[in-house]
Amino acid sequence: AKILDTRIISQLPNRYHGWPTLTRCKNGQLLVVCSGGRDQHVCPFGRVDFQRSNDNGNSWTYPRTILDGPIDDRDTGVLETMKGSLLVTTFTSLAYVPSLPKDNRKKGWLAAHNRIPEAQRKAELGQWMIRSTDGGITWSKRYPTIVNSPHGPTQLSDGRLLYAGKKLWSEGKDIGVCESHDDGKSWQWLSAIPTREGDRHQDYHELHAIEAGNGRLIVHIRNHNKKNNYETLQSESDDGGKSWSKPHSIGVWGLPSFLTRLRNDSLLMSYGHRRKPFGNQVRLSKDHGLTWSAPLSISDDGSSGDLGYPSTVELADNSLLTVWYEKLSGNRFAVLRQTRWTIS
């Protein structure tokens, strides 16, 4: 990849930013959401922060908090639907609780934790969506989605929205896809994605879906099973998402993957590379996801594995813009980084 420009786009230096998603609207405006306001990777402070750019990422608005529940709001996705609505996704977590200090060193953590009584905390766990029909000025109350994944749902050409993900808070932790027929207002379970022999489906995480140019649906899955550990696995559907192939390796070490369909119908996968060289990579498919190219490096100057979750959009001039989060060397607060690049 030919890198044109790399910069930090977050604007709160004393806050940790995590797990963003970038999307491009039909009018050319760019939107980024992230889990903002944080103290660290796991903490009680997470909220959904929203920024926009009207100049292809050269400048970004100051972040606006569009959702902040009483516990930790984590990975955030954003999408503009075919009808022009904006959908933002997140999930809530109490994973910070074991780290609550017993010795008052982090009084703020305890104060945040105690914003609601113990009895109500478990009821706050969920996977959530908020929706805007006025371009992000006003937002709905949050409402539950059946599954969650970091980057949220995808728009299909038949008008449906497809959300590939995991039932985070149900007993079975099922992996599969949901669909919406009403522009994201309500969601129905469509189908499970089968488990490969020898795998536990509980070790599949962080899915993302795209519709290829030939109508095939592709889902990428973060894999923590022993076989192909820390690789991105792939599953396909040729019947609109009613049935799926068993997940299989595509030879890509790195995770999680975000899928983009380019104007020329190539598919692009963007993923974090959490071993040396620490950074973010992309690969191209020119055959609707059958095969993937060798990796192209988008960034390789990371200092640790606390980085990634890249998402990529194609700009009007066919250059590409990728946004991810990264904890830079010497700074305990992760930032949002952006690079503009071309396929050289």
Give a label for each model feature:
Residues 1-344:
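Asp-box/BNR beta-propeller blade signature and adjacent active/binding-site loops
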